[in-house]
From Swiss-Prot:
GO terms for molecular function: nuclease activity. The gene is yqgF. One of its GO terms (cellular component) is cytosol. The keyword Nuclease applies. It comes from Buchnera aphidicola subsp. Acyrthosiphon pisum (strain APS). HAMAP family: Nuclease_YqgF. This is Putative pre-16S rRNA nuclease. Could be a nuclease involved in processing of the 5'-end of pre-16S rRNA. SMART domains: YqgFc. NCBIfam families: RNAse_H_YqgF.
């Protein structure tokens, strides 16, 4: 089963793809966004190409589990995916995924590797693999 994951952000949205047999994901791309709104044609192209069973969207929460300012925008993004593309969308806790992504990238490439695009797509992989491991 193929699954796409999104690491939602106001300016950048990381994308990863994976499958449940290996429980592994890989980074695809980073979509530019304006106030959390991506180019929907690019999203459509990804969905048509990969034909995922469903989509996982990272749910940004504070460490204590409460909502952040961006949480509602992430939920709105997930709802738009659901209705625009008639696909099941699941939200998944993304606490500390950006920190983990930065750590992974830094270990591999040092400070030069810490580019925003790599961080968001790596975070999307972490969200996806976390979802696979939980379910």
């Amino acid at each position: 089963m193929i699954v796409i994951a999104f690491d939602f952000g106001i300016k950048k949205i990381g994308v990863a793809v994976g499958e449940n047999i290996t429980k592994k994901g890989r980074p695809l791309s980073v979509l530019n966004a304006q106030n959390g709104c991506p180019n929907w044609q690019l999203v459509k192209n990804l969905i048509q190409y990969w034909q995922p069973q469903f989509i996982v969207v990272g749910l940004p929460l504070n460490i204590n589990g409460t909502k952040q300012k961006i949480t509602n925008k992430s939920e709105k993004f997930a709802n738009l995916l659901k209705y625009k593309f008639n696909i099941v969308v699941k939200m998944h806790d993304e606490r500390l995924t950006t920190v983990e992504a930065k750590s992974i990238i830094f270990k591999k490439n040092g400070f030069k590797g810490l580019k925003e695009e790599k961080i968001h797509s790596c975070a999307a992989v972490i969200i996806l693999e976390s979802w696979f491991n939980q379910y």
